[in-house]
Every structure is written in C-alpha cells, then in structure tokens.
Amino acid sequence: HDWNARITRECYAALAKARVLDAQGRLRRTVNAYEWCSFDVGPTLFHWFDHHAPEVGAAIVAGDHAARVRLGYGNALAQPYHHVILPLASRRDKITEVRWGIRDFQRRFGRDPEGMWLPETAVDHETLEVLAEEGIRFTVLSPHQVTSPPPHGRPGRWQHAGRELAIFCYDGPLAHDIAFSNVLRDARGWHRRIAEVPMADDGVTICSVATDGETFGHHHRHGDLALASLIDRLEHDSEARCTNFATILADHPPIHDVTLVERTAWSCPHSLGRWLHDCGCRMNGGSSQAWRAPLRNGLLQLADGIHAAVETHWPAEAGEPWACRDAAGPLLDGVEALPGMATRLLEAERHALAMFTSCAWFFDDLERIEPPIVLRHAARALELLPEGVREPLESALLETIGQAQSNDPAKGNGIAIWQREVLREASGPARLAAGVAALRDLTPDALDDLVLPAHVVRLEGDDIVLVHRRRIDEVTRWRAETVVAGVVPMRVHVRRVDIAGQAAEHFAISVVPRPVRELLLAAARPMVFDATLGDAQREALRDGLLAPEAARMAALDGAWLLVGRDGLDEAGVVVHAALDLFDLDQATPPDAAVVAAFEALAPLPPSPTRDALASRLALALPES
C-alpha cells in the first residue's frame, strides 16, 4: 500500500472531520481538530497533499485560520523542510533547512510562523541559535531535554550567544500514556487527568502533550474519536480551555531560565545515537544496527564532495552559491535566469540535503524502504555533478556503504542494495520513455492527460523526447519497441538515440512511472473486465462493491474460463491481458492463482502461447 495514502485516510483526513458521538454512539457533530490543537505538517508531506489529498491540506490551513480568528494566533508550527536531525547537520545546512521550512509555511498559511517543531525534537545550541536568528520565537521539547523545566507547563527562556528563544516542555507522562497506553480508549478519563493537573498560585496551569499524528487512528484505532470527544468536553468546561503555544507565549512570557541538555531527542536516550550508530534503539530485539554508521559516513563523504564541487564549478556570474541555494528553495524558484551548470549544482544540493532524512536510520534494517530512498537521492545528486567529479565520489560512497550489512544475509550489503534498489531508479528517464511508448501504442490520446512533475514529453516521428522542467537544457531522445501479449506491453525495449552507441535497455511494464501506469490501467481495465467479468461482477464493480484485488482475480478466473471454452490459442491473449492488470498494479498473482494456472496448462500440448504463459508465471511445465 501507499503509506501516505493509508495514514491520510486513517489519521490526517479523519482529524479534519473528527466525529463526536453521543452516549448511544450516534454521530452528534464533527470538529476540525486542526482548529483546536497545535500541530506541524512537514513540507514534504504537505507537497504530497497538494497532489493526492488537496482537501486535507485545505482543512489543515482552514483550522489554522479559525484558530487565528478565535485566539489571535494560529495553531500551526513550521518545520525544517526535510525531516533531518539538525544537530548532526552543518550550520549552513541548518540555515537552509530552516529558511526553506519557513518559506513553505508562509506560502501555505499566509503568515510568518511563531514556532518551529524540530524533527524528533533533536536539539543543540546551534540549532536554537539558527531558529532565533530566523525569527522563530519558540519550540517544544521533551521535559528531559532541559534542566529544571519551568513549573506548571510555563515556557522557559533559553539564552545563548546573545540569542533568546522560548521553550515549552510538554507533559511527559501524559504524552507517553497517550502514545503507548490506553488513554485514548477513555476520553472522560483523559479529560479527568487534565483536570487533575496541579494548579499554579495564579490560577493558570498549562497542560500540553506532544505525540505523532499517526497516534490518532493508526497506532490507536478510533483515536480520532477520543480526541474529538476531548475537544468537545473542553469546549464546555468552565475551568479549562483549548489554546495554543503562541497565545500562551503572548499572555505569559517566560520568566524562568532553562539550560539545554545538548544533542538530545525525544526518541533516543543515547545522545542522537539512533542516527549515528548501533546505540541499542530498535523496533525489534535481536537485530544489529551496525549499518547505521557506514551509511551516514558514506553520505557525509558524498555531501562534502558535492559541496566542494559547487565551490569549484559554480559560475562566477551566478553570484554566491549558498545564498543562491537559500533563495532558490526546494522548488528552484527563479533559476531560469541562471547558467545551466548553476541549475544542475543547485539540484544536486537539493538532493544532498534530502539524503539525511532521519527515517533512513530510525528503523531496524538497511534493506527497509527508507535507506534506499536516501541512497536514490545520492544517486541523483551524483548524476548531476560534472564529469570527472562523479566517478571518484561514487566509488568512495560504495566503498563505505559496502561496510553496511543487512540483518538478512540474502539482502547483502550496501553495495548490493545500491545495485538492486538504487540503480534501477537511476534509469528514470529510460523507464519514463518505456511508459510513454506503451501509452503511444495502446491509447495515444491519453498522452494529453499525462502530467509529470519533472518532465515534458514530446513525440517527434518515431522519437520520444523528454525535456526536464527545471533544467530545460537536459533533453533526451529515445526510440522504443513494445512487446505485447495481452492489451498492454509486457516489456519495452528502449534505446537513447541522441548519444551514439547506446545499448537498448529492457523494462517490464510494472516499473514504469506511476502516472503512466495509472493511465494504462484506465485504458486496460474496461477492455479486460468487459471480456472476463459476468454481468453481476461488472455491476458490483460499478457500485464500488468489488475491490481492485478481487476484480483482478475475477478477471483472471474469467480468462481461464474462456480458455476452457475457446481453447488456449484463441483465449490465451485474454489470460495475458488479465495478468497485465497485476503488472500495472505492481501486484503478484497469489499462489493459488499460480497453482491454478499450472493445473490448467500442464495437460495441454506445448505451444508458443503455453510457453509464453509458463514463462510469465514462472512455471516449469512438462514438455508433453
């Protein structure tokens, strides 16, 4: 499944219309939790909302606006652009991440941020200095990250090197119980715990908690209901009210000085060891995280090499490179006026920053989805560097990550993962050309509906031309041949024709970019379903009563029924067409379907159709 889509459905969207139930379990009202709770949304997640769940992004912004109307200050906190552990970044990279995060916040919420949430609450003095220099007024930390947190939840005053910032420390025990205990099963009990917090002499006590948004609906099913019920109860509580950090700071400026415990985070008690080495933090016991150190060291070496390449190859007429990086932002705004080399180097820097996204080190194994993602950023950064710079940097990277070993011996080390998971992604333009060829041959009109984030596509005779949107000087030209057994190509052979002597590459249709596969599916499904499904199944499909997985299996079952009726030579193409749907969905036929195919094909005499299906399904059929 798509993780963002799942969590959006279970949590982020649910919180935008959180349900308040009456005593009989009937829906009484909905509340937009973003109007009542302080929150932060990472810029990269917000970017995903823009394309896949714009209504959720709109509800989040609306919640912040409603809080501003009610309180005078919005609920939203900014976040550094990438989810990086800022104390492990250079000061220059800290500044860029914070500036990019502030800019994204301003664009979305139409105001300057008062506060900034630090990824994993990872903090040191330099990080807070950068926040203060960039106009941030407060952040939120775990109580163990400062010495002597101020009493009654009041903000503390951090001062260092002439800079000052307010620090809120959340209620650690309550936050822990919300995340890891049963608090969300009893909104009344949650409300009671808040009411029992000791009162200050002046009658003002602040109770704040901090937890992941995924707590409400994913980690705890129906957690959104508990939060909605609490909000409803607090609305009618004469002795407590929902507020936000910025409002508290305005009404109760800090009077207690706090001392920072440097290089700490809320999710690791080992001085940021979780993102450096095998510190003992893990999801499951018994696994080794010795891979963390070589992964970070390899990427640090590469980042140093990228920065050095920028210093060496940056065009003098483009101005100061690091100021230009900050100004261009993650979307490379305004780079059209820059020389091509400057644009390429800025793009390389964007990927160099993304290489340190914290989740790559958080979990248990090198072979999980997260480490290959940061390595793909590394591969793209290398691809953008000048000739002669790229090769030694890549060799040094591989030498270091070769020391990183997966806990599964079959998965190998960092080099094996680079070759298996990363180099495939590095062939992005070729895979895109393969997908465009498939669309051209199946449903050419759909090319008008193909919207790609990074490329513009043109057809010029037999050539497929790809033009990069941000680097218009990056143009590639391809020829492609498709191999069709069903309705869409099983595989595509592509060859770059603007460089002499380039060998053809071969791609299964399952690896072409998702926007292309979605258009191919939209064209293929009606053809396959009309040929294979019965009237009742088609009606269930139209009514949304037949899930995609069930529809694929029903189509495959229907195709085999046609083979039984019309023979393999006549109906084998329909079986291939049904299998095309699995490929386009990047799904594998279940074992039962493979066994059924073996039993259907084994008694039949050898034929090209039989052999092709056996090859596609990895069947070792008897020869006669």
Model features per residue range: what roles?
Residues 533, 537-624:
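Eukaryotic RNA-binding helical-repeat scaffolds
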Residues 463-553:
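Terminal end segments
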Residues 1-21, 44, 153-438, 516-525, ...:
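Active-site and substrate-binding clefts of carbohydrate-active enzymes
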Residues 389-496:
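C-terminal amphipathic alpha-helical interaction region
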Residues 4-114, 122-176, 188-203, 221-224, ...:
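Catalytic alpha-helical scaffold of carbohydrate-active enzymes acting on polysaccharides/glycoconjugates
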Residues 60, 77, 84-87, 91, ...:
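Non-catalytic regulatory/linker segments of enzymes
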